[in-house]
A protein has these predicted regions:
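An alpha-helical, amphipathic repeat domain used for nucleic-acid recognition
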Residues: 1-224
Length: 224
C-alpha cells in the first residue's frame, strides 16, 4: 500500500532537517540531504519509507560523529562510545566509522601522533604514561608503539621540560622540600626515579646560579 507525500516542511529548530507528511499527517523527520529527491505528490511504498528512515539514521549518525570530531581529534573507540550513547545501532555505528575512515576523519595512528605531540609540547610526560593514556583511548599497542617510535625527544629532555614548568613555584623551598615536591610531580608524570632526580638537580642548580635567585633558595646543599 502506497502513501502520498502531501507536504515537506522545514523544521523550525533545525534548518538542515525537514518534516515529511504522508497522506496529510506527520510521518517522520529527514535530513535535507536524504529528502532531496522527495516532493509533494510523490507516492512511496513501505519499502521506500523504510529505506528513507534507515538512510536518515545513517546520515544523522555521520553528522553526530562530525560534530563530536569538531571539538578535537578522537580515537575510533571514542566515536563508537559517543554514538552508542546516542542510541545508534551497532550496524549504523560500524558504517559511520567506515565512512569517517574513508574521509580520513578518523585515523588512530594520526590521532596518537597528535596526542603525543600535544603532550610533549604543553604537558611533557614519559612514554610509559603516554602509552597508558592512549590505551585508555582504545588504541591498540601496535598503533601506539608505531606512533611513539616517531618521537625524537629524549625522555631526559621531556623530564627537564616538565620540571621547568613547575620549578618556579617551588623556588623558595629548601633543597629537601624542593626535591620532594618536584620529584613527586615528575614521578606522577611517569618518569623513572633516576630520570626525575636528574631533572630536579639540573633545575635546582640553574635556579641557584641565576643572578636574581632569592637568597633563601640557596640555603641547603644537594645531598642525595
Amino acid at each position: 500500500m502506497e502513501k502520498e507525500v502531501t507536504a515537506i516542511k522545514a523544521q523550525k529548530r533545525n534548518p538542515n532537517r525537514v518534516n515529511i507528511y504522508l497522506d496529510g499527517e506527520f510521518a517522520f523527520g529527514l535530513s535535507r540531504i536524504t529528502a532531496a529527491w522527495l516532493q509533494p505528490g510523490r507516492k512511496l511504498t513501505q519499502v521506500e519509507i523504510d529505506k528513507l528512515v534507515n538512510a536518515d539514521d545513517h546520515e544523522v549518525a555521520f553528522q553526530q560523529a562530525l560534530h563530536f570530531l569538531s571539538y578535537r581529534a578522537r580515537s575510533e573507540r571514542e566515536i563508537r562510545k559517543n554514538l552508542a550513547a546516542k542510541g545508534f545501532s551497532e550496524a549504523i555505528i560500524d558504517e559511520t566509522i567506515e565512512k569517517c575512515k574513508a574521509g580520513n576523519y578518523v585515523n588512530d595512528l594520526e590521532f596518537a601522533g597528535q596526542w603525543i605531540d600535544n603532550r610533549n609540547t604543553f604537558r611533557p610526560r614519559s612514554p610509559k604514561l603516554l602509552k597508558m593514556e592512549l590505551r585508555q583511548k582504545g588504541l591498540p599497542d601496535a598503533t601506539i608503539d608505531q606512533a611513539l617510535e616517531k618521537v625524537t625527544v629524549p625522555e631526559e629532555e621531556l623530564a627537564y621540560k616538565a620540571a621547568q614548568s613547575k620549578a618556579e613555584r617551588y623556588q623558595l623551598l629548601d633543597w629537601q622540600s624542593f626535591r620532594t615536591k618536584l620529584g613527586n610531580f615528575l614521578l606522577r608524570r611517569g618518569f623513572s626515579y633516576q630520570v626525575a632526580m636528574q631533572a630536579v638537580k639540573q633545575v635546582w642548580q640553574e635556579l641557584a646560579d641565576h643572578p636574581t635567585s632569592p637568597k633563601t633558595h640557596l640555603n641547603g646543599e644537594i645531598n642525595d
